[in-house]
Design a protein with these regions (language model features):
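Active-site core segments that coordinate phosphate-bearing ligands/cofactors
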Residues: 1-22, 31-42, 46-49, 64-221
Length: 221
């Protein structure tokens, strides 16, 4: 039986502080939060058969949620009065109209807003932001993972720098090979799990570096 519902980072917070909590931003992606009003949605809880008592307490990302438990402090060798926050603001994307791009396995683009909005095409997702406002998020499923796939699975190398050395400044924007980075389907803006990747513009004289450049630019653009 389910005792409590929490996200992975919330479990770490719980082990540190003993507090069952999450932040509004992460809760926005659980499909159980009324993002506009920043509270758990009774409608969604009823649909999913989830009791609100099993859900974590909600905090703004910057708010302290507690201090270390005696056990955690002893294990980590830290003072017990160390303050633990729900999350952190590290990219400076606070206040309306700020943009942040985060690239990892997938790639996300965040645009902050002072007001709540819903994209009727469902290409962007609305989340609560750390400053009490909101942000719209677009996500591509394959970002830096495309470079990893190309280098390691196709070229059989982990020397990324060597592969990118031939891509000099004069070649940027001048490549005639294009790469569609849909290796795992796509979310924003297509929401199409059947989307597939492709190289376009290949010729007999297409050099290896042009393909590497196409992979990088395909993700970037």
């Amino acid at each position: 039986r389910i005792e409590k519902i929490m996200l992975p980072k919330d479990y770490i917070n719980y082990k540190l502080t003993g507090v069952h909590c999450t932040d509004y931003s992460d809760a926005s992606g659980m499909l159980l939060l009324d993002v506009e009003h920043k509270c758990w949605s009774k409608e969604m809880l009823d649909i999913c058969g989830v009791q609100e008592s099993k859900l974590p307490k909600l905090f703004e990302s910057w708010q302290p949620v507690g201090t270390l438990t005696a056990e955690a402090a002893q294990t980590l060798g830290l003072p017990a009065d160390v303050v633990v926050c729900a999350a952190a603001v590290g990219c400076g994307a606070v206040g309306g109209g700020k943009c942040n791009i985060s690239l990892g396995t997938s790639g996300t683009v965040f645009i902050t807003s002072d007001t709540f909005g819903v994209d009727k095409q469902n290409a962007l997702h609305s989340f609560a932001n750390a400053d009490g406002g909101y942000h719209l998020m677009g996500c591509i499923l394959s970002a830096a993972s495309c470079n990893k796939w190309w280098s390691e699975e196709v070229l059989h190398t982990t020397d990324y720098a060597a592969e990118q050395t031939p891509i000099t400044a004069d070649k940027l924007g001048a490549n005639d090979v294009y790469f569609l980075p849909y290796l795992m389907g796509e979310r924003s803006p297509h929401n199409d799990p059947a989307s597939r990747g492709a190289f376009v513009g290949l010729r007999m004289d297409t050099p290896r570096a042009a393909l590497t450049q196409a992979v990088l630019e395909g993700v970037a653009f």
